[in-house]
């Protein structure tokens, strides 16, 4: 009891068995951290994509994280050096494999990102992306397309662990391994996280998401489901057009938005629109559910656009949405 279980057609399945079963790409305002946030955000995004494409990627990452936690405990507890060296042997095995997976995947992703970024900016800016494993100490841009074999990765990782072992013991935490791999984006040669404008950073994230969806389709031969959570308000007109053009290409998409004016009549006409009105509290008791009125039938595209234009094209709040009330509470 209390343990999460997964069933597929009534049969129990491991979490790894479900990876990629329904491939999807999620785009939310929080994803802007991909361009300007911590390096761990980019590593997590790359691993999430890799886990959808390959169960091995998911399993290797899971194994590495277990080994890393164990090693960090040993370092924190000032365990004997022999124990740490023994743990390093296991870390090299799964760590080198994970970095190899990442490098090969990122090479494909970066090429697609560059193409989409050029399209978004009408060719006025160039995007480069660099992946550098933790054992390298060079400029990420110099290794944007470099991949390496498993044996090479194991040797390089083992050498780096031996070289920095003393520093790890002093700082009481692991410093070398896939948890320290670097991913950088460059716009016309400048680091996007440090020097990119907000608009440029948003273009980087949009290019990442479009490339992610394309890569899933190319490798799995299956179109992913797109989940777009209120991102239109975060994009300017040019970036919205690029995203709308992509989702118009026969790909199942779920979108939340407060302004239907972001979409053209053709897209609205083909969509099934569900509108939520202002929530009505049914109880003052803390924890009680709030009820919404929901319309489950399509809304005429012209009516939807007309209502949006009457609001001056500005994002509408739930109370400003056209009435979509059903009989009774949904």
Question: Where are the language model's segments positioned?
Answer:
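Short polybasic amphipathic segments
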Residues: 2-9, 183-188, 273
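Charged, alpha-helix-enriched surfaces in structured cytosolic catalytic cores
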Residues: 13, 40-44, 55, 59-62, ...
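Hydrophobic/aromatic beta-strand patches that form the interior of the parallel beta-sheet core
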Residues: 25, 254, 272-274
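Nucleotide-state sensing region of NTPase/ATPase domains
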Residues: 1-41, 45-57, 111-118, 161-166
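Long, low-complexity, intrinsically disordered segments
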Residues: 302, 306-330
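Long, non-coiled-coil amphipathic alpha-helical linker/lever segments
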Residues: 46, 53-102
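Conserved NTPase motor "head" modules and their coupling/switch loops across ABC/AAA+ ATPases, GTPases
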Residues: 82-225, 234-238, 242-250, 254, ...
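Walker B catalytic acidic pair
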Residues: 229-231
């Amino acid at each position: 009891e209390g343990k999460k279980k997964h069933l597929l057609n009534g049969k129990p399945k491991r979490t790894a068995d479900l990876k990629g079963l329904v491939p999807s790409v999620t785009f939310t305002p929080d994803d802007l951290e991909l361009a300007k946030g911590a390096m761990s955000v980019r590593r997590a995004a790359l691993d999430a994509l890799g886990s959808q494409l390959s169960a091995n990627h998911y399993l290797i990452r899971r194994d590495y994280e277990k080994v890393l936690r164990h090693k960090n405990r040993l370092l924190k507890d000032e365990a004997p050096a022999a124990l740490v060296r023994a743990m390093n042997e296991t870390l090299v095995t799964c760590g080198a494999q994970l970095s190899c997976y990442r490098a090969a995947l990122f090479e494909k992703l970066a090429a697609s990102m560059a193409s989409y970024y050029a399209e978004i900016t009408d060719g006025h800016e160039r995007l480069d992306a660099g992946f550098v494993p933790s054992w390298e100490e060079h400029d990420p841009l110099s290794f944007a397309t470099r991949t390496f074999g498993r044996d090479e990765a194991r040797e390089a990782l083992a050498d780096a662990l031996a070289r920095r072992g003393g520093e790890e013991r002093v700082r009481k935490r692991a410093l070398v391994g896939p948890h320290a791999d670097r991913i950088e984006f460059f716009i016309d040669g400048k680091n996007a996280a440090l020097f990119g404008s907000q608009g440029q950073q948003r273009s980087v994230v949009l290019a990442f998401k479009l490339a992610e969806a394309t890569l899933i389709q190319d490798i799995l031969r299956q179109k992913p489901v797109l989940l777009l959570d209120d991102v239109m308000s975060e994009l300017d007109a040019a970036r919205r057009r690029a995203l709308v053009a992509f989702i118009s290409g026969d790909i199942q998409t779920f979108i939340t938005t407060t302004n239907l004016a972001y979409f053209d009549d053709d897209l609205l006409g083909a969509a099934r629109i569900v509108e939520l009105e202002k929530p009505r509290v049914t109880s003052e008791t803390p924890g009680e559910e709030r009820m919404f009125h929901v319309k489950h039938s399509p809304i005429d595209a012209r009516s939807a656009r007309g209502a949006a234009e009457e609001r001056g094209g500005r994002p509408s709040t739930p109370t400003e949405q056209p009435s979509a009330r059903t009989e009774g509470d949904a």
